[in-house]
């Protein structure tokens, strides 16, 4: 928290400075009380602390700009000693001589246990340094602490203003750190009040999410479906469905080439010149709102969409290629259906602004009734009756790779050269496959989710691009507790034809030195990325080399966690870790330069992230793998693997065929089974 500390020429100000810095994680900015108040950049601060000092608050030379800071800053304020007396004086109280001067003496203070005193014992010992005392309070101020009948603490009844007569920073005061931490939390909570309110309705029903999506959103504006088609304990439990038809919805698209965010809303279209991560961070800060009680997930509305791989240029990498689709696209969702696959319940969330609740409440009523009447979940997902890959005749007729077999092997050998010469430890080399077919994106996605259920699936139907994602990999999640978690995947085996073969493949993956080396390098890379923004000592690895099994493959997965430092936002954490290390290799920046040179083109959505940024401060993003991208120019997907010194070039190429199975099977099956003229994305847009 960024704090303005006004120094009233006191000898204890920098003791207060140190304690505030320890509590807030960032040092306060100190100004003397005789500076020009109008020159203070108040918009750069989250709170004001007014220090102790000599003299009287009614004397301008003694109190100076402290008075205007209390009355005009609009920020949360804590006054200490003279600062406390100033608050009492400015709001109409009287400050006179105390019954006796008290300096450097310890007294017990009793309190009501509210606000800055929350969670503190009553009484506790504090140090007093004062000859004056507030002996009467105005109606606007409420006494909340006393000693020997004298007021030791106040709060304003309607403004975020508090005062304490004693010195919490003194070496002999108890619970000074905790009192300042309470002020920090009060200030942050006040600043988070954005005028937005989240309304909730719970429906005791588990609808079929595909049927519900088709009924409510398939033909809507900017529909989205974050799809936990495979429910795994501790990983996936909720699916989120919605579109951009709400009154507060906004659609953001970003192009690195121009550095502009285009914002489309009900009031029109505007452009903002800003890096995307900075714009997103500022909007989330302005719109922050807590999650209502009883909601069992952290996504309380906010931004849903994708971050494309080329957005790496905002994380320190070079901008080399320009993708066909936007480099980032996010919908500000003000309406949402959340399906709880574990509890068998559904939650509806709607956002209102400045007390205009009628539209939100009406939507909850109408949509809740439709959810209650929707078909129930039928458990349709499961294994495909057949798997196709890049060697299948049906696929070979319509597929074209950016790099053919020989070209891909040549690039793998170049990776070996870079590794041998110390330029990289691991290069996550990928290929792009284009499919000359015509699909209906939603039909293809629903088939993909049936044959390859995953915890982090997604369907996005945005202007100019549809994204059909069957990702098993989490990039990064951040809870409201500010704990960040990454789950990189490195190491893949196909499923076996028999239980015995399947178990053998799983065991081989778990014990293979090459796969463990791949995984370990990315674990260490992500530990580094999280350490950039995390508390000292908080980054740890609760799971190393864990095998997770999905319909087409076994995967080797590790888990890394860290707790963000107070001054680091969730968006800053995402930016520090983006793109996910499992899609780059290490060292990250040098390896991305190698990737740009070898791959000869943009990755686009592939290798980026899909998910949400909540108004609660929470985040959940996947890694974009096993994903089809449909644009006006056709259908494509990326596929690749990590190249290390232990890699075998032919085996790496063969692994890309395994990883492509779900995508090509979904495309070929739906293209062949179309009952009418199939359509490209362009056809669908023209029809709309």
Residue positions per predicted region:
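Extended alpha-helical targeting/anchoring segments
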Residues: 193-688
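Pocket-forming structural segment of enzyme catalytic cores
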Residues: 64-80, 85-174
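Charged helix-capping and loop-helix junction motifs
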Residues: 61-68, 145, 178-180, 443, ...
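Flexible gly/pro-rich beta->alpha loop and the following alpha-helix that scaffold active-site loops
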Residues: 2-6, 10-79, 91
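Short loop/turn elements that flank and shape the SAM/SAH-binding pocket of Class I
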Residues: 36-39, 134-135, 331
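Acyltransferase
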Residues: 169-194
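Active-site flanking residues adjacent to catalytic metal/cofactor-binding acidic residues
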Residues: 6-7, 166, 523
């Amino acid at each position: 928290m960024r704090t303005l500390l006004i120094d009233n020429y006191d000898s204890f100000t920098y003791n207060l400075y140190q304690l505030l810095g320890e509590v807030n994680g960032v040092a306060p900015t100190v100004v003397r009380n005789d500076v020009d108040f109008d020159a203070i950049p108040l918009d750069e601060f989250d709170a004001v602390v007014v220090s102790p000092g000599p003299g009287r608050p009614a004397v301008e030379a003694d109190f100076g700009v402290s008075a205007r800071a209390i009355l005009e800053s609009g920020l949360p304020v804590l006054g200490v000693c003279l600062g406390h007396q100033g608050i009492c004086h400015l709001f109409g109280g009287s400050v006179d001589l105390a019954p006796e001067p008290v300096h450097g003496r310890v007294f017990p203070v009793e309190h009501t246990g509210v606000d800055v005193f929350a969670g503190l014992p009553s009484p506790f010992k504090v140090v007093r340094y004062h000859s004056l005392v507030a002996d009467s309070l105005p109606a606007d101020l409420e006494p909340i602490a006393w000693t020997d009948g004298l007021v030791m603490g106040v709060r304003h009844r309607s403004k975020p203003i508090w005062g304490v007569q004693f010195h919490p920073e003194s070496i002999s005061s108890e619970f000074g750190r905790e009192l300042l931490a309470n002020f920090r939390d009060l200030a942050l909570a006040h600043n988070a009040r954005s005028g937005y309110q989240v309304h909730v309705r719970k429906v005791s029903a588990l609808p079929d999410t595909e049927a519900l999506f088709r009924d409510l959103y398939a033909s809507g504006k900017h529909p989205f479906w974050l799809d936990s088609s495979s429910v795994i304990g501790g990983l996936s439990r909720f699916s989120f469905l919605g579109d951009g038809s709400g009154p507060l919805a906004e659609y953001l698209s970003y192009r690195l080439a121009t550095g502009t965010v285009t914002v489309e809303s009900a009031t029109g279209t505007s452009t903002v010149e800003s890096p995307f991560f900075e714009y997103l961070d500022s909007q989330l800060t302005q719109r922050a709102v807590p999650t209502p009680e009883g909601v069992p997930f952290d996504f309380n509305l906010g931004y849903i969409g994708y971050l494309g791989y080329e957005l790496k240029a905002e994380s320190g990498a070079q901008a080399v290629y320009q993708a066909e689709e936007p480099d980032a696209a996010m919908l500000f969702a003000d309406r949402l259906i959340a399906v709880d696959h574990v509890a068998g319940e559904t939650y509806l969330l709607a956002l209102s602004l400045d007390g205009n609740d009628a539209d939100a409440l009406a939507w909850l009523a109408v949509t809740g009734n439709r959810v209650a009447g929707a078909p129930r979940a039928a458990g349709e997902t499961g294994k495909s009756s057949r798997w196709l890959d890049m060697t299948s005749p049906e696929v070979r007729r319509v597929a074209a790779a950016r790099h053919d077999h020989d070209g891909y092997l040549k690039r793998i050998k170049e990776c070996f050269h870079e590794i041998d010469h110390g330029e990289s430890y691991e290069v996550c080399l990928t290929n792009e496959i284009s499919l000359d077919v015509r699909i209906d994106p939603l039909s293809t996605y629903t088939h993909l989710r049936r044959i390859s259920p995953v915890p982090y699936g997604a369907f996005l139907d945005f202007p100019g691009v549809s994204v059909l994602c069957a990702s098993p990999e989490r990039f990064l999640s951040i809870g409201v507790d500010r704990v960040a978690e990454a789950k990189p995947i490195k190491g893949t085996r196909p499923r076996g034809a028999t239980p015995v073969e399947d178990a053998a493949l799983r065991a081989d993956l778990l014990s293979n030195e090459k796969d463990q080396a791949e995984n370990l390098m990315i674990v260490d890379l992500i530990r580094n990325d999280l350490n950039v923004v995390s508390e000292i000592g908080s980054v740890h690895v609760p799971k190393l080399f864990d095998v997770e099994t999905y319909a087409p493959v076994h995967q080797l997965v590790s888990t890394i966690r860290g707790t963000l430092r107070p001054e680091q936002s969730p968006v800053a954490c995402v930016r520090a870790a983006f793109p996910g290390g499992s899609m780059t290799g290490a060292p990250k920046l040098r390896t991305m330069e190698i990737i740009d040179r070898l791959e000869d083109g943009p990755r686009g959505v592939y290798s980026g992230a899909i998910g949400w940024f909540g108004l609660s401060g929470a985040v959940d993003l996947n890694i974009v793998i096993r994903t089809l991208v449909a644009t006006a120019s056709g259908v494509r997907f990326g596929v690749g693997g990590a190249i290390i010194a232990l890699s075998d070039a032919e085996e790496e190429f063969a692994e890309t065929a395994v990883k492509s199975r779900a995508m090509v099977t979904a495309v070929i099956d739906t293209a062949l089974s179309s009952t009418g003229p199939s359509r490209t994305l362009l056809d669908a847009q023209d029809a709309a």
